[in-house]
Amino acid sequence: MIRATIILAAVAALAFSAPVPEVPENYDDIPAEYKSLIPAEVSEHLKSITPEEKAILKEVAKGYKDFKSEDDFLNALKEKSPTLHEKASKLHQIVKDKVNALNDEAKAFVKKAIAEGRKIHAQYLAGEKPSLDTLKTTAKTHIEAYKGLSQDAKDSIAKEFPILTGFFKNEKVQAMVGQYLN
């Protein structure tokens, strides 16, 4: 779950910026409307990553198929850069605490979304850019799954991930989903 929130934001940005063929390399290149979807802790994390650390992330991500767990990924980062490992571990713990605070239904939904997002993000970092259809399908799947959650699960997500909830409820997002997925 180390990159969980980043991944969720990245999936959202990828899915809803469909006409843009490249994902921004730098935080400053992310369009303002998508920056507002990124939680403050994640924004600070993204801004703090140096170009050298980005290169390390890309290098480590190339082996994403070999990682059985987040701990495997973190250990690989630690071998390459203790500083990057420390940054990643902090973010990982923030997200893990938020996920663990969710009720069971919400936790299952978020974990599934994180797993999908992690896979797509790792593929992207490894140079295997997912197709637009894959991104569209992933976005649609998660939005529909969110709509199918009980009100208690939605409330639980809203408490821990208010920006994510805003994303799922945002009328502009819904319109964009309809435009790109239909």
Curated annotation (Swiss-Prot):
It comes from Caenorhabditis elegans. Residues 1-17 form the signal peptide. The keyword Cell division does not apply. GO terms for molecular function: lipid binding. Its main location: secreted. Probably binds lipids. Residues 86-106 form a coiled coil. This is Fatty-acid and retinol-binding protein 1. The lineage of its organism: Eukaryota, Metazoa, Ecdysozoa, Nematoda, Chromadorea. It comes from the Eukaryota. It holds the Pfam family Gp-FAR-1. Gene3D superfamilies: 1.20.120.1100. It is found in: Secreted. The keyword Coiled coil applies. PANTHER family: FATTY-ACID AND RETINOL-BINDING PROTEIN 1. Belongs to the fatty-acid and retinol-binding protein (FARBP) family.
